């Protein structure tokens, strides 16, 4: 298997609290967007962006590596079997630019898909995940707690998201 993915599919507005925090409606179906392979970066390399691009927000995300093909016929019950590994990632967003693009009704790619905007930690074998409904994670920046995540709070559970993707 190639170590470089053919595509990176992301889920926006996946947590009700975060959608409301940004003034977005809670979606009736998953909001998907993509990042190109050039957006990938290793956490070991650190995080950087051009400050001239504006304010950059980061969100810690549970990240799944899909090792088996998912099709339109894949149902949620079988979708989890396609996952080969998990990690945490940072989804970087040029928030001012994204807000401007949203107001104009334009796509978000310029704000979400720039080089280095998908920062990943090392992969962990999927066997380490004991309960997909309760994967808990935190993000600390300089020893300060910035984010708490838990799959129990997702609008759509992991299996449903995978089947939809």
Where are each of the predicted segments found?
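Catalytic-core "active-site belt" of small-molecule-metabolizing enzymes
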Residues: 1-165
């Amino acid at each position: 298997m190639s170590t470089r993915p053919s595509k990176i599919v992301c889920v926006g507005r996946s947590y009700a609290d975060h959608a409301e925090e940004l003034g977005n409606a809670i979606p009736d179906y998953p909001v998907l967007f993509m990042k190109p392979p050039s957006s990938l970066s290793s956490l070991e390399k650190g995080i950087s962006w051009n400050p001239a691009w504006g304010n950059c927000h980061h969100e810690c995300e549970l990240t799944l590596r899909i090792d088996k093909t998912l099709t339109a016929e894949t149902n949620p019950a079988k979708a989890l079997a396609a996952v080969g590994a998990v990690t945490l990632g940072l989804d970087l967003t040029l928030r001012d630019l994204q807000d401007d693009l949203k107001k104009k009704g334009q796509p978000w790619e310029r704000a979400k898909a720039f080089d280095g905007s998908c920062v990943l930690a090392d992969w962990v074998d999927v066997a380490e995940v004991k309960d997909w409904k309760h994967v808990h994670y935190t993000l600390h920046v300089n020893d300060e707690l910035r984010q708490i995540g838990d799959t129990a709070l997702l609008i759509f559970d992991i299996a449903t998201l995978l089947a939809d993707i």
